[in-house]
């Protein structure tokens, strides 16, 4: 049932010519998902999601990122973000657009 619905949806999408990058019907009845352009993708994608008989293929191998890769991206962007916000706050205060008031001395 799901295979038939996926094939019908693929035929409607491919037949209308609206977007050929979502699903396409391959030779032999296989339904594939992904880009149909000739350019190679840097991200590994899975082109065929259903076998010819209609069975769904098993999950692909998951690639873990690792803490070193995550921190090597997060920390520099956090630092750049703090520099931008600090400089923008100083600019606003310099032009008297926003001057914070210390109202904490109400004791």
UniProtKB/Swiss-Prot annotation:
Biological processes, Gene Ontology terms: calcium import into the mitochondrion; mitochondrial calcium ion homeostasis; mitochondrial calcium ion transmembrane transport
Known function: Essential regulatory subunit of the mitochondrial calcium uniporter complex (uniplex), a complex that mediates calcium uptake into mitochondria. Required to bridge the calcium-sensing proteins MICU1 with the calcium-conducting subunit MCU. Acts by mediating activation of MCU and retention of MICU1 to the MCU pore, in order to ensure tight regulation of the uniplex complex and appropriate responses to intracellular calcium signaling.
Keyword Repressor set for record: no
Protein name from the UniProt record: Essential MCU regulator, mitochondrial
Mitochondrial matrix side: 48-65
Broad class of the protein's primary localization: mitochondrion
Subunit comment: Component of the uniplex complex, composed of MCU, EMRE/SMDT1, MICU1 and MICU2 (or MICU3) in a 4:4:1:1 stoichiometry. The number of EMRE/SMDT1 molecules is hovewer variable, ranging from 1 to 4 copies per uniplex complex, leading to uniplex complexes with distinct gatekeeping profiles. Interacts (via its C-terminal poly-Asp tail) with MCUR1; the interaction is direct. Unprocessed form interacts (via transit peptide) with MAIP1.
Keywords: Calcium, Calcium transport, Ion transport, Membrane, Mitochondrion, Mitochondrion inner membrane, Transit peptide, Transmembrane, Transmembrane helix, Transport
Family, similarity comment: Belongs to the SMDT1/EMRE family.
Pfam families according to UniProt: DDDD
Membrane topology of the entry: Single-pass membrane protein
Domain of life: Eukaryota
Keyword Disulfide bond: no
GO annotation, cellular component aspect: mitochondrial inner membrane; uniplex complex
Gene from which this protein is expressed: SMDT1
């Amino acid at each position: 049932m799901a295979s038939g619905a996926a094939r019908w949806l693929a035929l409607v999408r491919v037949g209308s010519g609206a977007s050929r990058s979502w699903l396409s019907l391959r030779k032999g009845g296989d339904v594939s998902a992904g880009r149909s352009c000739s350019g190679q993708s840097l991200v590994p994608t899975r082109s065929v999601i259903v076998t010819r008989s209609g069975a769904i293929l098993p999950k692909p191998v998951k690639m873990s990122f690792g803490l070193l890769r995550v921190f090597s991206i997060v920390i520099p962007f956090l630092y750049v973000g703090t520099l931008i916000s600090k400089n923008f706050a100083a600019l606003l205060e310099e032009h008297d657009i926003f001057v914070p008031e210390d109202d904490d001395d109400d004791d």
